[in-house]
Amino acid sequence: IRDSLVTGVQTCALPISYVDFGGESAVPLVERYPNLLVTGTFSKSRSLAGLRLGYAIGSRELIEGLERIKNSFNSYPVDSLASAVGVAALEDKAYFEACREQVMTTRERTRRRLGDLGFEVLPSQTNFLLVHHPDHEAAQQFVGLRERSILVRHFNTEALRDFMRISIGTEDEMDSLIEAMEAMIR
């Protein structure tokens, strides 16, 4: 990213949607690179997906450019209710930290348990895991979980065909997932 910013890319937009789950934020780079626009959302770590509320951090010039075109491209204008909810979400730091820690703890616990069942679990700093079992097709596991009313994602693309995307839920939900997966592979 730094190379792109230095070598003359006009503008580099970098989403940091999952950074609160353990990633490294690019926000500090904004001061050094005036062509960097960092974007974020309240959908992931703030659990406000239906609100369609996000933000952008960048140089004054980039933000002014966004202001000029926002009504042409933004299909989700921010109303006063969404704005108030966003401010409240930012102010309640204790609740945010508790939820964030719970997701990360549950993610790591789930990762370990899936690993114990023989799954390959890709490293994650998000609120989901990408998992693959060398002896069982992901598409069949996806169907088996759906039949048990457990919803995960399976992408029928070459790069992800062998993987399932498992969103991190409550501990009870993840226990149910593990039990179902264990029953399917045994």
Predicted stretch roles:
Residues 1-12, 16:
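Single conserved hydrophobic/aromatic residue that forms the stacking wall/gate
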Residues 2, 18-33, 37:
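Conserved core of the PLP fold type I
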Residues 35-115, 119-122:
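PLP-dependent aminotransferase class I/II
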Residues 50, 125, 159-162:
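Short acidic/glycine-enriched loop/turn segments that link adjacent beta-strands
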Residues 58, 131-135, 168-170:
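Short beta-strand-to-loop capping motifs
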Residues 103-104, 113-148, 164:
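Conserved PLP-binding catalytic core of the aspartate aminotransferase-like
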Residues 144-153, 157-186:
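PLP-dependent enzyme catalytic core of the Aspartate aminotransferase-like
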